[in-house]
Amino acid sequence: MKKVLLAVLLAGVTLSATAAQTIRFATEASYPPFESIDANNKIVGFDVDLANALCKEIDATCTFSNQAFDSLIPSLKFRRIDAVMAGMDITPEREKQVLFTTPYYDNSALFVGQQGKYTSVDQLKGKKVGVQNGTTHQKFIMDKHPEITTVPYDSYQNAKLDLQNGRIDGVFGDTAVVTEWLKDN
């Protein structure tokens, strides 16, 4: 599978230091280490740090909102927000809807399941694998592995919980995010 690319999507935001402005960013904040919500109910992570650095550079103020992943592009198109800062693959379909910056992070994807239960994708035939709704991970499984039942989730956090509780057999997600999960489990 093509490596995952993270990108900033911009809609009508002129990134110049000529006038102080507020840039309204949206993300799906259950995606550590890129985006998550801390103990103070604040959105934090790599993408937030990058957005804040961008705002500092252009003398703007950043605000962040948490939304379902599959609502990010519609929110941008309807100008409810100014930019998306989230782990989002650049695809031809998405490029028809929004503008992307140059990618700033490459990532791969992997399956994770109960320890020692599955050692190959072939063993997931007929099994339920969680994916985040609207992602290229979902499309990849549906297109390349129709023998696997995809279970869409609004967040990878909910897929992780269902995996831990035995309601699904695996999760297919970004390597960096899954690695963060495995640190805690």
Question: Which role does the model predict for each range below?
Answer:
Residues 20-87:
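Extracytoplasmic small-molecule ligand-binding "clamshell" domains
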Residues 48-49, 63-74, 116, 151-165, ...:
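Short helix-initiation/N-cap motifs at beta->coil->alpha
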Residues 1-19:
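Gram-negative bacterial Sec-dependent N-terminal signal peptides
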Residues 26-31, 65-70, 79-91, 114, ...:
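Beta->alpha turn/N-cap motifs
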Residues 28, 98-110:
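Short Pro/Gly-enriched coil loops immediately N-terminal to beta-strands
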Residues 101, 113-129:
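Flexible hinge/capping segments at coil-to-helix
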